[in-house]
Curated annotation (Swiss-Prot):
The gene is CML42. Residues 25-60, 116-151, 154-189 form the EF-hand domain. Expressed in seedling shoots, roots, rosette leaves and flowers. Expressed in the leaf trichome support cells. Gene3D superfamilies: EF-hand. Disruption phenotype: Trichomes with increased branch number. Pfam families: EF-hand_6, EF-hand_7. It comes from Arabidopsis thaliana (Mouse-ear cress). This is Calcium-binding protein CML42.
Amino acid sequence: MESNNNEKKKVARQSSSFRLRSPSLNALRLQRIFDLFDKNGDGFITVEELSQALTRLGLNADLSDLKSTVESYIQPGNTGLNFDDFSSLHKTLDDSFFGGACGGGENEDDPSSAAENESDLAEAFKVFDENGDGFISARELQTVLKKLGLPEGGEMERVEKMIVSVDRNQDGRVDFFEFKNMMRTVVIPSS
């Protein structure tokens, strides 16, 4: 039993960027992910759409395993997961892998929370900094946006404008401090 708990903690530490600890950010990000995965915009994510999205992210999942996991969350009569089903699946996965770590709020005054937040930001930065040089170039940003299936990745001019909007020192690329500043100043609409 102790070994199982240690394994969960180890997985949680290695994959801390998966955990979405702030409830308002969690809901916003989860809705955005749902919208990205719902390719035809019908309000449902089919097993096939989920499989395609995971493949684009480099997470090749066995279709039969995915089907057996996901189908139990699909309501009778629906063609796929609606947002509530998707949220339930996410919560179950979070509880299974991370002990429900995404449900709680963040305490900015807590030094360990601040360190985790910094670590999460560093992991997110590495996703975009594909060559590991410490900067996000327009080409790297475009590559990631395309992998995610986002239309913004289709036009380099649009990607360059995104870079310019956060590039405070005007060197044509985003460093980690500019990335952190951008992530911390994202405005989340209140409901």
